[in-house]
């Protein structure tokens, strides 16, 4: 009987693993797509648009052409549309100050590159964004929000720091800390899930970073494994602050529909006002994914996934009671009852799941990380996705034409922005 039971268990496990692999492959392909792109595709899907839940979420009654596909050309940007980089700007910096070595990340508006400063011999991650793409999607406010948040968080150990920024006629350059331990998403892809002690360590550092942002009245709104990096020692570093919302006080709310589909909180899906507890929902979703390998309510069918988020009970197996209690608190569908609704980070910090964490030691990086990326130096790119690193570096990003003044003052930025047509026509930057 024992032999038969073990054989049956092995067959079942193998079958389930095959199914899980298929789900993971589909999941990995879909989740890098931003929410705007997802909604754009959803709006063009006649079958999906007929689904009552989709109509409720997106407030559409029939398929419609997405705004970005409108054939009418956008008018030239007015001075009010110019991007002012503010006090982070370095008016003397220019692209030719850097050797751009490798592509290490991609986003909706540009790429992140490993670069070495020629004079300083220092390595940076340089985020290069296309102004034209930003204006086309009317995302200037998000770019400014990211810049503002970056200016505020340079002293926190678990938030990426901004060194300076500059611009050319058609691009924005943000010079950031270079973090080369890899995305948490990359490590989850390789290992599928983490043991509870490792997940606890990461969750604690993430919670510390979120608590710090909340203390500055900033709601992060886009926590997901792709935005969580590991440094060379294995500590967490949050990056990508484009969806942050500033000036949200303890009881303040906002209502913008944004985020990543797998991690949207119920109140966001309902298009109700939401507060900083949306970040604690996302922390719960990420912790769940670290323990189980997929987000808590994931489905390849997006409408079904949204219905799961809104209505399906949370299912938790094979974890400790303290982990179960924490996840039930963080993934509480009613935000007024969610863990963190009353005392924000202090509630998370004092939860029994984190009883083994010395928070002073954590913030001072005195706790040895459970995983060491073992990178040999800045040029060690083993933890970056080959999808990025094998892509050629666009030649245009390192050019500093003499005819273009690199600056960040309001008037000069306006002149540079209006002159972005200097970009080579063969440039395949985006």
UniProtKB/Swiss-Prot annotation:
Residue positions binding ATP: 104-112, 127
Expression induction or repression: Up-regulated by aldosterone in distal nephron (tubules) of the kidney. By dexamethasone and serum. By tumor suppressor p53 in mammary epithelial tumor cells. By FSH in granulosa cells. By injury to the central nervous system.
List of catalytic residues: 222
Primary enzyme class: transferase
Biased composition (Polar residues): 81-91
Tissue: Expressed in most tissues with highest levels in the ovary, thymus and lung. In the kidney, expressed within glomeruli of the cortex, at low levels in outer medulla and moderate levels in inner medulla and papilla.
Gene3D superfamilies: Phosphorylase Kinase, domain 1 (3.30.200.20), Transferase(Phosphotransferase) domain 1 (1.10.510.10)
GO cellular component: cytoplasm; endoplasmic reticulum membrane; mitochondrion; nucleus; perinuclear region of cytoplasm; plasma membrane
Gene field: Sgk1
Family the entry assigns: Belongs to the protein kinase superfamily. AGC Ser/Thr protein kinase family.
Effect caused by changing residue 421 to A: Decreased activation of SGK1
Protein's name according to its UniProt entry: Serine/threonine-protein kinase Sgk1
Major place of residence: cytoplasm
GO terms of molecular function: 3-phosphoinositide-dependent protein kinase binding; ATP binding; potassium channel regulator activity; protein kinase activity; protein serine kinase activity; protein serine/threonine kinase activity; protein serine/threonine/tyrosine kinase activity; tau protein binding
Protein kinase domain: residues covered: 98-354
Region (Necessary for localization to the mitochondria): 1-60
Domain AGC-kinase C-terminal positions: 355-430
Recorded coiled-coil stretches: none
Organism: Rattus norvegicus (Rat)
Swiss-Prot/TrEMBL keywords: Apoptosis, ATP-binding, Cell membrane, Cytoplasm, Disulfide bond, Endoplasmic reticulum, Kinase, Membrane, Mitochondrion, Nucleotide-binding, Nucleus, Phosphoprotein, Serine/threonine-protein kinase, Stress response, Transferase, Ubl conjugation
């Amino acid at each position: 009987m024992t032999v038969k039971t073990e054989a049956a268990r092995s067959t079942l496990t193998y079958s389930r693993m095959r199914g899980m692999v298929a789900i993971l492959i589909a999941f990995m392909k879909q989740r890098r797509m931003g929410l705007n792109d997802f909604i754009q595709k959803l709006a063009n899907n006649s079958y999906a648009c007929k689904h009552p839940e989709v109509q409720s979420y997106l407030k559409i009654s029939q398929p419609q052409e997405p705004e970005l596909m409108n054939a009418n050309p956008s008018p030239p940007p007015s001075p009010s549309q110019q991007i002012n980089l503010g006090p982070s700007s370095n008016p003397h910096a220019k692209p030719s100050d850097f050797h751009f070595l490798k592509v290490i990340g991609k986003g909706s508006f540009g790429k992140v590159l490993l670069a070495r400063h020629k004079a300083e011999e220092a390595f940076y991650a340089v985020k290069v964004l296309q102004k034209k793409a930003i204006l086309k999607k009317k995302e200037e406010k998000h770019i400014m929000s990211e810049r503002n948040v970056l200016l505020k968080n340079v002293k926190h150990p678990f938030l990426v720091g901004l060194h300076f920024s500059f611009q050319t006629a058609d691009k924005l350059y943000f010079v950031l800390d270079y973090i080369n331990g890899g995305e948490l998403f990359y490590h989850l892809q390789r290992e599928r899930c983490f043991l509870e002690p490792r997940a606890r360590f990461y969750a604690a550092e993430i919670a510390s970073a979120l608590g710090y942002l909340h203390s500055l009245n900033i709601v992060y709104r886009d926590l997901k494994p792709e935005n969580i990096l590991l440094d060379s020692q294995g500590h967490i570093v949050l990056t990508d602050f484009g969806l942050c919302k500033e000036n949200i006080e303890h009881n303040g709310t906002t209502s913008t529909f944004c985020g990543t589909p797998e991690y949207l909180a119920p109140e966001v899906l309902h298009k109700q006002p939401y507060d900083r507890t949306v970040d604690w929902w996302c922390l719960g979703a990420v912790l769940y994914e670290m323990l189980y390998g997929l987000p808590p309510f994931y489905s390849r069918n997006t409408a079904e996934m949204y219905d799961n988020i809104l209505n399906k009970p949370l299912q938790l197996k094979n974890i400790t009671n303290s982990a179960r209690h924490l996840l039930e608190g963080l993934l509480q569908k009613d935000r007024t009852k969610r863990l963190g609704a009353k005392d924000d980070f202090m509630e998370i910090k004092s939860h029994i799941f984190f009883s083994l964490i010395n928070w002073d030691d954590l913030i001072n990086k005195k706790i040895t990380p459970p995983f060491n990326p073992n990178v040999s130096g800045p040029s060690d790119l083993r933890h970056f996705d080959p999808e990025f690193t094998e892509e050629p570096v666009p030649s245009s990003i390192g050019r500093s034409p003499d005819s273009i003044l690199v600056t960040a003052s309001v008037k000069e930025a306006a002149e540079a922005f209006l002159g972005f047509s200097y970009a080579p026509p063969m440039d395949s930057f985006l």
